[in-house]
């Protein structure tokens, strides 16, 4: 089957688009994105879609950027594909946000794509991820430690994002580029082994192909099966949470402790997100929450984003962690006998002689205290 027919069948099977949709292609000028844009432009009449393109200049390779921009503009002009071009400062963004270059470049690129899609009325954004990208992602997740979600690799679709080339091999894409005389630019950073992904691509994958020439296809298929299993288990976890939830972010700890691990460990991140947490939880954090289901009423553990998980009698509760008053800062001040001072979230009063503490008070007896008495934050 030709790449064109394979992509058409794949898009139809996964219902990536609907007739009348406008699709924005992420066009970098590299081979994958050029093949993607060419394919979608050719398939547009059969899919009933309109195709537009967007080209983002990251500012990381100023010597290559003009050539890539010219290629994208010429390619789109010849085919009457509307194109939006924008330039960003990735290094400045990374400095400001405190993130790595790859992470910063990706954040800027996707923010640009989504902004353009909104402005142009494009319901879908197509990216050029292919089978090798998916295999690299699965292997990368395995090396770092992952569950079934990570084994699923790159999703076929993700909200407004679609990946029509995800089952296409790199060889099939290169053949398509050659047969259709499609020009493209090569990114020299793809050859630099300073990046972990490139080491996987240039060192690990050739060894796997030597074991089985279809290794990439088999790994990708295994990822698809893992993704389907994950979707089913996620639905089981969501139903369990619905049945045993006591409040947003709270669940019956005893019921959760008796649940199958495969369900319980998917409920835990759901509780975390209900409490305002973002992203995923590491295995360490899940194990910490799981241990709370087995412990007494006073146990707690800290989670990312200022969230706390706590065992409250028969409940496992996730909530925003309260600020510790001892960590607050304030200006030092002098205490005078009988005059209350409110600082750092406390009311402090200096007395002579004995003083019994009320239900919301603490009394401390300091022998040989010398005046003046100063109240200050902890050092």
Give the positions of each predicted feature.
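AMP-forming adenylation/ATP pyrophosphatase catalytic core
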Residues: 3-32, 52, 56, 90, ...
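Flexible helical/loop "lid" subdomain adjacent to adenine-nucleotide binding pockets
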Residues: 124, 130-294
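Generic detection of intrinsically disordered/low-complexity segments and helix-coil linkers/edges
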Residues: 104, 123, 178, 189, ...
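Secondary-structure boundary/capping residues
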Residues: 16-20, 49, 81, 114, ...
């Amino acid at each position: 089957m030709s790449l064109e027919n394979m992509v058409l069948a794949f898009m139809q099977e996964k219902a990536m688009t609907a007739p009348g949709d406008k699709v924005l292609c992420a066009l970098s000028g590299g081979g994958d994105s050029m093949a993607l844009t060419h394919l979608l432009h050719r398939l547009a009449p059969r899919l009933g879609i309109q195709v537009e393109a967007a080209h983002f200049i990251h500012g990381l390779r100023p010597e290559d950027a003009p050539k890539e921009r010219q290629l994208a503009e010429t390619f789109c002009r010849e085919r009457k594909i509307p194109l939006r071009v924008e330039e960003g400062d990735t290094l400045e963004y990374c400095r400001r946000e405190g993130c790595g270059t790859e992470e910063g470049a990706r954040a800027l690129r996707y923010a640009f794509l989504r902004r353009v899609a909104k402005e142009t009325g494009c319901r879908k954004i197509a990216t050029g991820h292919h089978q090798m990208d998916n295999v690299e992602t699965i292997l990368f997740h395995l090396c770092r430690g992952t569950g079934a979600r990570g084994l699923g690799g790159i999703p076929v679709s993700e909200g407004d994002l679609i990946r029509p080339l995800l089952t296409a091999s790199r060889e099939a894409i290169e053949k398509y580029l050659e047969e259709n005389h499609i020009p493209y630019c090569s990114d020299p950073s793809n050859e630099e082994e300073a990046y972990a992904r490139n080491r996987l691509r240039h060192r690990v994958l050739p060894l796997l192909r030597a074991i089985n020439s279809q290794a990439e296809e088999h790994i990708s298929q295994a990822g698809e099966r893992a993704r389907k299993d994950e979707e089913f288990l996620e639905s089981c976890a969501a139903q369990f949470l619905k049945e045993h939830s006591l409040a947003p972010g709270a669940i019956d700890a005893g019921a959760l402790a008796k649940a199958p691990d495969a369900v319980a460990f998917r409920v835990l991140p759901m509780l975390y997100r209900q409490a305002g947490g973002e992203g995923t939880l590491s295995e360490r954090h899940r194990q910490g929450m799981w241990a709370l289901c087995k412990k007494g009423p006073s146990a707690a553990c800290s989670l990312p984003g200022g969230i706390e998980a706590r065992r409250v009698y028969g409940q496992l509760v996730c909530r925003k962690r309260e600020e510790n008053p001892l960590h607050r800062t304030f200006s030092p001040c002098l205490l005078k006998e009988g005059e209350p001072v409110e600082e750092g979230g406390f009311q402090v009063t200096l007395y002579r002689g004995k003083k019994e503490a009320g239900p919301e008070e603490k009394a401390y007896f300091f022998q040989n205290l010398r005046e003046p008495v100063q109240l200050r934050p902890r050092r």
